[in-house]
Regions:
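Alpha-helix C-terminal capping/helix-coil junction sites
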Residues: 45-46, 241
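Membrane-interface starts of transmembrane alpha-helices
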Residues: 30-37, 204, 208, 265, ...
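C-terminal helicase lobe
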Residues: 1-42, 75
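Alpha-helical interaction/regulatory segments in DNA maintenance proteins
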Residues: 258-288
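Helix-hairpin-helix
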Residues: 223-243, 249-252, 256-270
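Long C-terminal interaction/binding lobes of large macromolecular proteins
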Residues: 18, 206, 236
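C-terminal helical accessory/scaffold domains
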Residues: 38-40, 46-228
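Active-site-proximal structural scaffolding
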Residues: 7, 30-37, 43, 59, ...
Length: 289
């Protein structure tokens, strides 16, 4: 971020900056201090975020965007590598596993003894689909991989509209931790969408943004048209959908009283009718809405 903002433009300026930090105060006398800074620069250059010409430092367009997104360079690089492997018609769980495996999602969801069997079965089902490397069960990274997989399944069940009580009982994840994971997943998907622009992966952006909206609201894809309206969350949307009111067309063509009866609020029902208009719609009208 120092280079991206042009606060420093040379290697010696960067080293002097770090010498003035608490880390520098502690380790400035360490023989390898400057080498550590230079090694970190080489890593960021390898990631494609930085150009080093002699002693001059300049962030690449991709590096500047990573800095603007407040992503850790290593985590951003891992995300980019996964996005490049992602197919345009990706399954939800594949992208969820990618972001759940990212270092920015740490700490991952803890696993209990009862989780191992179903997580191993889930891993077998996913191993040929996911874009992240799956370790062997005897590798030291295996338990961490299972934690990442559990995190991905947790978020998937959230967008499948399973409630917080179910997630607490089955995954031992309290509401506060769940909200933290949801928030981080949203942020990573926003970052993924923005990075796709610079990577030229435009065909993946729509699917990423749709999944981000679903995570924010905890809904299946079929509820998106309803939840886009003010005053309709996932509970009200599901009640409307189950009653056969599935979109703006359906809302326009039923009475305010029926909507109020379903969602339990006359005031919100009136607001919804104002948003969609009172005129009855045909299928052709709906397509042009």
């Amino acid at each position: 971020s120092l280079v991206a903002s042009e606060f420093v433009t040379k290697i010696d300026e960067l080293i002097n900056f770090f010498k003035g930090t608490f880390y520098g105060y502690q380790y400035n006398d360490d023989f390898g201090f400057e080498y550590k800074v230079e090694d970190a620069l080489k890593d960021v250059e390898k990631f494609g975020f930085l150009n080093i010409q002699g002693t001059e430092l300049k962030a690449t367009p991709l590096g500047r965007r990573v800095s603007e997104l407040y992503l850790d360079p290593s985590a951003a690089f891992d995300l980019i590598q996964g996005l490049k492997k992602l197919t345009s018609d990706f399954e939800d769980i594949v992208l969820l596993h990618l972001i759940s495996s990212n270092a920015e999602m740490y700490p991952w969801t803890n696993i209990q003894k009862k989780d191992y069997e179903w997580l191993e079965e889930t891993t077998e089902e996913l191993v040929d689909k996911i874009v992240t490397k799956a370790p062997k069960e005897w590798d030291y990274e295996y338990v961490e991989f299972l934690k990442k997989t559990k995190t991905a399944v947790l978020v998937r069940d959230w967008i499948m509209e399973l409630n917080e009580d179910y997630l607490l009982e089955n995954y031992n994840v309290p509401p506060g931790e769940l909200r933290n994971k949801i928030s981080t997943a949203e942020w990573l998907l926003y970052g993924a969408s923005e990075l796709c622009v610079l990577l030229g992966e435009m065909e993946k952006i729509s699917g990423i943004n749709k999944l981000k909206f679903r995570i924010k609201n905890g809904i299946k894809e079929e509820l998106i048209p309803l939840v886009k309206l003010r005053g309709i969350g996932r509970v009200r949307a599901r009640k409307l959908f189950n009653a056969g009111i599935k979109n703006v067309l359906g809302l326009r063509n039923v009475s305010t009283e029926k909507i109020a009866g379903l969602i339990g609020s006359e005031k919100v029902a009136q607001s919804i009718k104002k948003q969609v208009g009172h005129k009855r719609m045909t299928e052709a009208d709906f397509e042009n809405f």
